[in-house]
Swiss-Prot record:
It comes from Drosophila melanogaster (Fruit fly). This is Oxygen-dependent coproporphyrinogen-III oxidase. Pfam families: Coprogen_oxidas. The active site is at H195 (proton donor). GO terms for biological process: heme biosynthetic process; protoporphyrinogen IX biosynthetic process. InterPro entries: Coprogen_oxidase_aer, Coprogen_oxidase_aer_sf, Coprogen_oxidase_CS. Substrate binds at S181, N197, Y198, R199, G348, A349, R350, Y351, E352, S353. Its EC number is 1.3.3.3. Homodimer. Keywords: Heme biosynthesis, Oxidoreductase, Porphyrin biosynthesis. It catalyses: coproporphyrinogen III + O2 + 2 H(+) = protoporphyrinogen IX + 2 CO2 + 2 H2O. The lineage of its organism: Eukaryota, Metazoa, Ecdysozoa, Arthropoda, Hexapoda.
């Protein structure tokens, strides 16, 4: 029996509401009371029956055991229309979620595992939340996918119009969104935090026309600067971009530097990476392949850094600095992050889930300023003035 541990909380695109638990015909469960950081929740463990068989369509079997849970869309539908971009994106994000979760679990020294929650949304779709908390390597890690449909509220439509989308003002429009999103907060201050998000969006206009686009990015937030790590991270992302267009990396690197700027502090959240949105060219197939390459570059860009630093010694000073920088992370997410804003605009959104990207612990000190020649000061110079790493 393969036990899947389910925990209610979602790091998502910031748009989705948890409504009810999924109980398949081969599932049984029990409730556990627990708590997670800023949110309280219950955990459910399901043991899937050994008699459960992956569905077949035209003799082809989908091996769902490689995923963290059953797909959101019925497996027969996924196999029956594999050329549908909605289905292709769902399979991709399921794969990315499972591969990344297992790569992180392999770095835990004491065998800590992700808890998994598969949830549904009555308006359409659902998601899979994977949470690893209080590990010896990862203090808090969330890796999540969402596949949802619904109607965009007018405020969200207005936000998209501001980005140049040709949508009718004041309308409530049907949409489809799918994506994988992760924020990893390590325990050791010498291991950086990583965030990535890759998504696909469709919206139907008042005239019945369908608009689609991809978005996403991967960025790194170190607490102590290691230039070799920064170069490795950026070079890995650049290689993924260069497979498709040599102009992508410099464009999306600058976009990332601009987007993750904490304007009221005049500093960056981290050392950047790549960031892009509204990608709908040169065609849907090419855009999907580009997003796939970027998503698959996450593990080789990040896991070697975890392995390199996870067992390094550190003291209270390093820990306090890590908490101060996490305070900056909180400031950005609550004030500037587009996904958080989008979620807060969405009626009925599960706000604990939207805020789950926040770290377990953060710190603010009045007028804190590190010495310029200290290791902390070296990081601040780069955060004040982003640089090229490759």
């Amino acid at each position: 029996m393969n036990a899947l541990r389910h925990t209610i909380s979602l790091v998502s695109l910031g748009t989705f509401q948890l409504v009810r638990r999924t109980r398949g015909p081969h599932a049984r469960g029990f409730l556990l009371g627990t708590g997670l950081g800023l949110a309280s929740f219950s955990a459910v463990t399901y043991a899937h029956s050994a008699e459960a068989v992956d569905p077949k369509v035209n003799g082809v079997q989908m091996n769902t055991s490689r995923f963290m849970a059953e797909p959101i869309t019925d497996s027969k539908a996924l196999l029956g229309d594999k050329e549908n971009m909605r289905h292709r994106m769902e399979i991709l994000i399921m794969e990315i979620q499972a591969e990344f979760c297992r790569a992180l679990e392999a770095e835990e020294n004491c065998g800590q595992k992700f808890k998994v929650d598969r949830w549904e949304r009555p308006e359409g779709g659902g998601g899979i939340t994977c949470v690893l908390q209080d590990g010896d390597v990862f203090e808090k890690a969330g890796v999540n996918i969402s596949v949802v449909t619904g109607s965009l509220p007018p405020a969200a439509v207005q936000q998209m119009r501001a980005r140049g989308k040709n949508l009718k003002e004041g309308a409530s429009l049907p949409f489809f969104a799918s994506g994988v999103s992760a924020v990893i907060h390590p325990r050791n201050p010498h291991v950086p935090t990583i965030h990535f998000n890759y998504r696909y969006f469709e919206v139907e206009t008042a005239k019945g026309e369908k608009q689609w686009w991809f978005g996403g990015g991967t960025d790194l937030t170190p607490y102590y600067l290691c230039e070799k790590d920064a170069s490795h991270f950026h070079q890995t992302l650049k290689s993924a971009c260069d497979e498709h267009d040599p102009t992508y990396y410099p464009r999306f690197k600058k976009w990332c530097d601009d987007y993750f700027r904490i304007k009221h502090r005049n500093e960056s959240r981290g050392i950047g990476g790549i960031f892009f949105d509204d990608i709908d060219s040169p065609n849907q197939e090419a855009a999907f392949n580009f997003v796939s390459s970027c998503a698959r570059a996450v593990i080789p860009s990040y896991v070697p850094l975890v392995r390199k630093h996870k067992n390094r010694e550190y003291g209270n000073n390093e820990r306090q600095w890590q908490l101060l920088r996490r305070g900056r992370y909180v400031e950005f997410n609550l004030i500037y992050d587009r996904g958080t804003k989008f979620g807060l605009y969405t009626p009925g959104a599960r706000y604990e889930s939207i805020l789950m990207s926040l770290p377990l612990h953060a710190r603010w000190e009045y007028m804190h300023e590190p010495k310029s020649q200290s290791e902390e000061g070296k990081l601040m110079k780069v955060l004040k003035n982003p640089k090229d790493w490759v």
